[in-house]
Amino acid sequence: MDPRLPAWALVLLGPALVFALGPAPTPEMREKLCGHHFVRALVRVCGGPLWSTEARRPVAAGDGELLQWLERRHLLYGLVANSEPAPGGPGLQPMPQTSHHHRHRRAAASNPARYCCLSGCSQQDLLTLCP
């Protein structure tokens, strides 16, 4: 056996080992996910209705449920903002004037889709949103 053979093997395998043992992308890497990219990532992490262990539901019903869940908080804020108190009845007290920046920040903190779009979400963040 030629003694140079193991040396050549190390020279050829060295770069492959560096790439294999180098820093791997972590699942905690935050990625900004907006719109349909957020929904696709959520379905990829949580699984879709076809893969769920629950009773099989039609795909359309699963999509509708996901969309309702994503927009639920936004709709609640819209209903409160658009409601008019009944005359003479107890109604919502007007909120003190706050800057647009604070309202925007508060809305982003309570809406997971908006948060992932603005700040980015890791795979672990998406897992916490699974039903």
Swiss-Prot record:
One of its GO terms (biological process) is positive regulation of epithelial cell migration. Residues 1-24 form the signal peptide. Residues 58-104 form a propeptide. Its main location: secreted. GO terms for cellular component: extracellular space. One of its GO terms (molecular function) is G protein-coupled receptor binding. Heterodimer of a B chain and an A chain linked by two disulfide bonds. This is Insulin-like 3. It comes from Callithrix jacchus. The gene is INSL3.
